[in-house]
Curated annotation (Swiss-Prot):
Start-end of Polar residues biased regions: 235-247
Role noted for this protein: Non-structural protein with ssRNA-binding activity. Is probably involved in the formation of viral inclusions, where the assembly of cores and the replication of viral RNA are thought to occur.
UniProt keyword rRNA processing present: no
Protein name: Non-structural protein 1
Name of the gene encoding the protein in the UniProt record: S4
C-alpha cells in the first residue's frame, strides 16, 4: 500500500525547516539580518554553509543560533566551533534565550582572552586554535551549497517512507504564504481533494515564534493588529519517496513577507523623509505635504517663530526659536541679521534686519558636558519645531547625546535659524542626514567616512570663518529673495543680480572689537599721562627729602636729649604714692582706679552690645523665616517643573495622537471617496438596466395587437395522406 503524508509530520518538519532556513538579506528594509534559533535535531547538519556573508551560525549544545554579529566577528568565519568551545569552557553557561544574549556573552569571553576589535586576525586565530580538538573541528565537505539555491536538489536525495513503499503517487504539499503559523491537528490523513484546504491555526507555534523574522519583530510595532485573513495555501509537487530513506521529512517553504508601514504614519517613507529634509533646510515649502493639512501644526509652529517674508515684507513673529547650541558657539554667526541680547537670566536674542525691524526672537539653550540624553529630551519637550546648530550636532555626537533626537515623528529639526545660512553650510546638513539614517553606534560602523568628514569640517575653525565671510559679503537683499518663495535658485539669483559692495553693517562681534579698540586707545593715553605725572611727583618727593633730611636729623637729636633728661610720670606714680602716702593707701587708690575702669568698661560694653544683640536676634529670626520661605519656593519649583515636564510629555503624546487621528481621517476620507465612487457606478449601472428593461417592456407592449382580428392569421397546411402513412423505423427512435 502507498503511504500518504500525515499532518503531524508536516507540522513538525515544516517548523523545523522554517527555523533552520535563514532569511534572505533583502527580505526587509531593516539593517541587521534576523537571528534564528531551533533545536539541532530539527535542523540540517550543513546549516553553517547556508549562512549569508553577513551572518554566522553557532551550534551550542544542539541549539543552532544564526544571525548577524558585530562586523569585526565576521573575519573569524570558520572558527565558529572554536568560539563555542571557548565560551562553554570559560563561562559554563549552555543555554541562551536569544541570539543577542549569546553574542554578548561570546564577545565578553573573547575580550577576556585578549580578542578585541583591534586585535589582528593572525593573533585572534592563534588564540582560537587553542580550543580546537577532534570534536570541534569542522568536517570536510565535497560541495558547498550557495545561499539562495533551490532546496529541490536536497529533496531529490531525501527519501521518506520505508523499503516496502514503492510507486507512491505524488501529493499536493501545502506551501504557506504568510506569517509563520502552526497547523491544526487532524484525525485522518488529508485526501487529494482536501490538500488545498486551509489547515492553519491562529496561534503560532513557540518554535516558529522564536525563529520568526527580525523584520516582523522590529518593523511592525507590538500594538499593530494581527492579520484579519488567513494566509493562502498554495500547492507544490513533491518528489516520490525513495525506498532507501527511513524518515518522513517533507519541506514547507515560507515565502518572505515585507513589513508594512504603521497605519498611523503620516505618509509613506519618501514623502516623510523629504518633509524632514525640507524642514532641516529651513524650507517647509519643499515638503510634499506642504499645504495639504497633514503637517499644519508643524507649519504653524515654523512660521510663528522663524523669519519669513512675502513680496519683501517681513512678518512679525509670535513665538520664539528654540535652538540648541554648543557651549562656546557665537549665535551671531547663525544668521545674516543682527542679534541683540535681552536682559534676563535666560539667553535670548532679538533678531533685527538692517532696517531695525524685529523678525524673530531666539532662545539659546546651551549643551553641557554633564548632560545625558534624557536631559536633552527634556529640553526639547513641548516644542514641535526645534533648531540645532552644526556645532551643537557635532557636540552631541562627541558626547553620545543623539539617540532619539533626530528621529521623532512628532518633531521637525531645523539645522539653524536662518535658511540662507543653512543652505550655504551643507556640512551641518550632511551630519543631519547621517544621524537621521543611522543610529550613532551604527553610523560609526556603516557611515564612518561620511561621519568623519562632516565632523572634521564642522569642528574646524574654517566653518566659523566661512559663515563670517558670508555674513560680511552677502548682499542685503538676499534674505527677501530667499524667503519669498520656494525656488531654490532665488538665493543665487539675488547674489548675481546684486551690484552693491559688501555690506558695511557692523556685526555684534565687529562692534565689540571696535569698542575694545577705542577703550584700549583711551587707556593707553591715560597710562602715558599718569606715567608723566608720576615722574614729576617722584622728582618733587626726592627734592623734599633732600630738604627735610638735615632738619629731621637735628630734630632727632633734640628729642633724644629730651627723652634722656625727662621721665614719664605714669611709670613712677605708684612708687611716688607709696613713698608719700604709704603702701596701704597707694594700694587702695590703685584698687579704686581698677574698679572705676571696670565699671566704665562694662557700661560702655553694655551700651554698645545690647543693640547689637537685639539686631542679631532679629536678623537670625528673619534669616530663619527666609530659609523656610526659600525651601517652600524650592519645593513649589520642583513640583512645577515636574508638572511642566509631565504636561510637555502629555503634549507630545497628544501631538502623536493628533498625527495618528489625522492619518486615520485621511484614510477614512479616501475610503469614503472610494465607496461613493463605487456606489455611483452601481447606481448608474442599475439605472441603465432599468432603462433597458423599460424599453424592452415598451417594445413588447407595442408588438401586441390592440384590437381583436386586426392581425391576419394563417393556419399551417394540413398533412397529406402519404405523410401520415409513413412508417417509422424503431432504430431511429434512439437517435
Amino acid at each position: 500500500m502507498s503511504r500518504r503524508f500525515r499532518l503531524g509530520d508536516i507540522r513538525s518538519t515544516g517548523v523545523a525547516e522554517y527555523a533552520s532556513t535563514p532569511v534572505r538579506a533583502d527580505a526587509s528594509p531593516t539593517t541587521n539580518p534576523p537571528p534564528t534559533a531551533a533545536p539541532a535535531s530539527l535542523t540540517s547538519t550543513d546549516s553553517h554553509t547556508m549562512a549569508p556573508p553577513n551572518q554566522l551560525t553557532f551550534d551550542l549544545s544542539g541549539v543552532i543560533f544564526t544571525g548577524s554579529p558585530p562586523a569585526w566577528l565576521l573575519q573569524y568565519r570558520g572558527f565558529e566551533k572554536h568560539m563555542v568551545t571557548m565560551l562553554m569552557l570559560k563561562s559554563g553557561v549552555r543555554t541562551y534565550p536569544r541570539f543577542d544574549d549569546f553574542i554578548s556573552a561570546l564577545v565578553s569571553t573573547m575580550a577576556l582572552m585578549g580578542i578585541v576589535p583591534q586585535t589582528s586576525l593572525t593573533d585572534g586565530e592563534v588564540i582560537l586554535m587553542r580550543y580546537a580538538n577532534a570534536e570541534t573541528l569542522p568536517e570536510p565537505e565535497e560541495t558547498t551549497r550557495q545561499w539562495g539555491d533551490s532546496p529541490e536538489a536536497e529533496l531529490a536525495n531525501e527519501g521518506y517512507g520505508n523499503d516496502e513503499i514503492d510507486n507512491t503517487p505524488q501529493l499536493q504539499a501545502p506551501l504557506i504564504s504568510g506569517p509563520p503559523q502552526t497547523y491544526a491537528a487532524a484525525a485522518a490523513p488529508p485526501s487529494l481533494q482536501q490538500s488545498t484546504v486551509p489547515l492553519i491555526s491562529a496561534t503560532p507555534s513557540p518554535a516558529l515564534s522564536r525563529s520568526s523574522s527580525v523584520a516582523s519583530l522590529t518593523s511592525i510595532p507590538a500594538c499593530s493588529p494581527a492579520p484579519s485573513s488567513l494566509p493562502s495555501i498554495l500547492t507544490m509537487q513533491t518528489r516520490p519517496p525513495s525506498p532507501s530513506s527511513k524518515s518522513h521529512q517533507p519541506r514547507v517553504t515560507l515565502p518572505e513577507r515585507r513589513p508594512t508601514r504603521r497605519p498611523e504614519h503620516i505618509a509613506n517613507d519618501e514623502d516623510y523623509n523629504r518633509s524632514r529634509a525640507g524642514y532641516a533646510q529651513g524650507k517647509p515649502s519643499h515638503s510634499p505635504m506642504y499645504g495639504s493639512g497633514r503637517e499644519s501644526h508643524f507649519e504653524e509652529a515654523f512660521f510663528a517663530a522663524y523669519p519669513h517674508s512675502v513680496d519683501g515684507r517681513w512678518h512679525k513673529f509670535s513665538a520664539s526659536i528654540v535652538v540648541l547650541a554648543d557651549p562656546n558657539e557665537d549665535p551671531a554667526l547663525l544668521t545674516l541679521h543682527s542679534l541683540e541680547r535681552e536682559e534676563g537670566a535666560q539667553e535670548t536674542y532679538i533678531m533685527r534686519t538692517s532696517a531695525a525691524f524685529a523678525v524673530a526672537r531666539v532662545r539659546v539653550m546651551r549643551l553641557r558636558p554633564t548632560m545625558s540624553v534624557h536631559d536633552v529630551h527634556d529640553m526639547l519637550a513641548g516644542h514641535p519645531v526645534v533648531s540645532i546648530t552644526g556645532r551643537a550636532c557635532a557636540y552631541m555626537v562627541r558626547h553620545k547625546l543623539t539617540d532619539g533626537v533626530f528621529s521623532k515623528q512628532f518633531r521637525r529639526i531645523v539645522m539653524g535659524i536662518d535658511p540662507v545660512m543653512i543652505r550655504h553650510g551643507t556640512q551641518a546638513l550632511s551630519l543631519f542626514a547621517i544621524l537621521t539614517d543611522h543610529r550613532l553606534d551604527h553610523a560609526h560602523t556603516h557611515a564612518a567616512m561620511s561621519l568623519r568628514l562632516a565632523m572634521q569640517f564642522v569642528e574646524s575653525p574654517l566653518y566659523d570663518a566661512q559663515r563670517s565671510w558670508l555674513k560680511a559679503h552677502a548682499p542685503a537683499t538676499i534674505h527677501c529673495a530667499a524667503t519669498s518663495d520656494s525656488n531654490a535658485d532665488s538665493t543665487l539669483s539675488a547674489i548675481y543680480r546684486s551690484d552693491s559692495t559688501p555690506r558695511d553693517q557692523p556685526t555684534p562681534g565687529d562692534s565689540t572689537i571696535s569698542q575694545l579698540t577705542a577703550s584700549n586707545q583711551e587707556l593707553q593715553i591715560q597710562i602715558t599721562a599718569l606715567t608723566t605725572t608720576n615722574n614729576i611727583q617722584a622728582r618733587a618727593i626726592a627734592e623734599l627729602k633732600a630738604c627735610v633730611r638735615p632738619h629731621s636729623t637735628d630734630t632727632h637729636h633734640a628729642l633724644s636729649k629730651y627723652a634722656l633728661a625727662h621721665t614719664c610720670i605714669n611709670t613712677q606714680e605708684l612708687p611716688l604714692l607709696t613713698s608719700l602716702l604709704g603702701e596701704d593707701t597707694a594700694t587702695a587708690i590703685q584698687t579704686a582706679r581698677e574698679r572705676a575702669k571696670d565699671i566704665a568698661k562694662r557700661t560702655l560694653t553694655e551700651r554698645v552690645a545690647e543693640p547689637l544683640r537685639v539686631m542679631n536676634a532679629s536678623l537670625e529670626a528673619e534669616l530663619t523665616h527666609e530659609r523656610a520661605h526659600s525651601s517652600e519656593l524650592r519645593a513649589t519649583l520642583a513640583i512645577l517643573e515636574t508638572d511642566l515636564n509631565t504636561a510637555a510629555r502629555e503634549r507630545d503624546a497628544h501631538a502623536h495622537m493628533i498625527t495618528s487621528l489625522q492619518s486615520e481621517i485621511t484614510e477614512l476620507r479616501q475610503e469614503r471617496l472610494t465607496v461613493i465612487t463605487s456606489e455611483r457606478t452601481d447606481v448608474a449601472l442599475l439605472e441603465q438596466r432599468v432603462t433597458d428593461a423599460e424599453r424592452h417592456a415598451v417594445a413588447q407592449h407595442q408588438s401586441l395587437p390592440l384590437l381583436y382580428g386586426s392581425v391576419s392569421l394563417e393556419l399551417p397546411p394540413s398533412p397529406t395522406e402519404d405523410e401520415l402513412l409513413t412508417s417509422v423505423a424503431p432504430a431511429d427512435l434512439w437517435d
